[in-house]
Amino acid sequence: MPKEPETEYDPSLGRKFIFVTGGVMSGLGKGITAASTGRLLSNAGFDVTAVKIDPYLNVDAGTMNPYQHGEVYVLKDGGEVDLDLGNYERFLGEDMTSDHNVTTGKTYKHVIEKERSGDYLGKTVQIIPHITDDIKRRIREAAAGTDVCIVEVGGTVGDIEGMPYLEALRQFAHEEASENILFTHVTLVPYSKNGEQKTKPTQHSVKELRSIGLQPDILVGRCSDRLEPATKEKIALFCDVPTTAVFSNPDVDDIYHVPLVIEEEGLDQHVMERLNVAEEAITTTDRTNTWRELVTRERTSSVDVALVGKYDLEDAYMSVHEALKHAGIETQTEVTVQWVDSDEMLDHHEDRLREADGVVVPGGFGSRGIAGKLKAIEYCREHNVPFLGLCLGFQMAVVEHAQNVLGFADAHSAELQPETPHPVIDILPEQYDVETMGGTMRLGAHETNIDPNTLAAAVYNGTVCTERHRHRYEVNPEYIDKLEAGALSFSGQANNRMEILERSDHPFFLGTQFHPEFRSRPDRASPPFVSFLKSVDSTLDARSLNVSTSEEVQI
């Protein structure tokens, strides 16, 4: 149950709130716009946090289909949340908690529980004020101790699910001083066939927002190119905002360039002026130099990495993509990710993988595509291709070793083949009596002890790491001695649970039961991903050397 407020909220605290809504269509990039604004304010010296409102009835994102919703992002406290919170963490450099994700399921559940326990003293429980009050409470609690809280409202203005939230924001603005509240509306500005930027979708979206009682202070136009001056003027006229409050957010090749783009537009300066705050004595150029150097760092090499999974929606593996990108920044490597569908590669997996310089097998659930993942792991083991297995990828590396190295042909995971005579992967003991699905896995940050003088110790530069987990199955303790009889070893453990595996007969073969991608940041890349790319680079250098030597011999 959510914690109760420490004290009655005092609006005179002067905390600033930026509410980000979206119009015309979903998937416009509200989250990136919100996160980029937060990055710029953080650069200016403010303590910034973020809240994501998801108007669905699910309590959290844990049971949602990755095809529809993208990846389930895991927070340090075990919260299973929308992938936008991953963007907030990566842009702001802050670890969020479950309190930073507000869902209709959470809110209604809490209010109904209070009604059942008699907290409302016989009152008729309604959307207004009980649901809206709970929404406002959650936002204020998440913002505690910060200077600025950015709140993104999921979905599109006009969606029936979002109505209680927009009403709560209207009340919020009524309760706070006007200089403490700013509404940013992100909208689509498409091109017509004759190349004209069309403002009508934006006008209608703002009209819908105003009908609810909300007037945007800032309009951000998502478009393929920057908004023309005439377009900005037209939007300003019909949407009743100053021309100086209309900003472009054009398409970019790399989302980490968005803060630089909107800074050039002057959005951060406008926000600070509108909220009546003064940035620290840091010049605009100086406060973005570090971020600019980071995201524009020159790449000195390039690699192709095969990502072997079953969800063909890129967002389903967003954190893995971003972690590879972060590792590329640190190692100055241009990383091209090649999608390999594990469900369709059985007959031609060698052709698909031969072109890859390294292979990543990410997490997932269910039996579909497992045979393809096992083939990919076998290929990497036999051909000395750098391999990184995450969660399910770690478990399948254990299964592949048992089947093809130890000769247990029927070995498998009890999750995928319950009748297997050799369940080398079995359910966690504490999961035996669990009958519900949501929020019941082993979740969140846990510490792993690493054996010294191992690949894992070199990767983490130490003998302890803390990473985030999301799993219900583990390596079966009864098979550990058998599994370690060959070149495979478990070099990381947590309370007798196997957390990291590696192979002594391979240049780089690493598997982790945890998800290191969830803690990766642009300025603090995940150690397993950095070491993986370094190994890929080294392997390429060795191949190049062998080719050169071979050519010299032929000459």
Curated annotation (Swiss-Prot):
Entry keywords, A to Z: ATP-binding, Glutamine amidotransferase, Ligase, Magnesium, Metal-binding, Nucleotide-binding, Pyrimidine biosynthesis
Binding, UTP: S26, K198, T199, K200, P201, T202, Q203, K234
Region (Amidoligase domain): 1-277
Functional description taken from the UniProt entry: Catalyzes the ATP-dependent amination of UTP to CTP with either L-glutamine or ammonia as the source of nitrogen. Regulates intracellular CTP levels through interactions with the four ribonucleotide triphosphates.
Other noteworthy facts: CTPSs have evolved a hybrid strategy for distinguishing between UTP and CTP. The overlapping regions of the product feedback inhibitory and substrate sites recognize a common feature in both compounds, the triphosphate moiety. To differentiate isosteric substrate and product pyrimidine rings, an additional pocket far from the expected kinase/ligase catalytic site, specifically recognizes the cytosine and ribose portions of the product inhibitor.
Family of this protein: Belongs to the CTP synthase family.
Subunit structure: Homotetramer.
The name this protein goes by in its record: CTP synthase
Native organism: Haloquadratum walsbyi (strain DSM 16790 / HBSQ001)
Lineage: Archaea, Methanobacteriati, Methanobacteriota, Stenosarchaea group, Halobacteria
Gene name of the encoded protein: pyrG
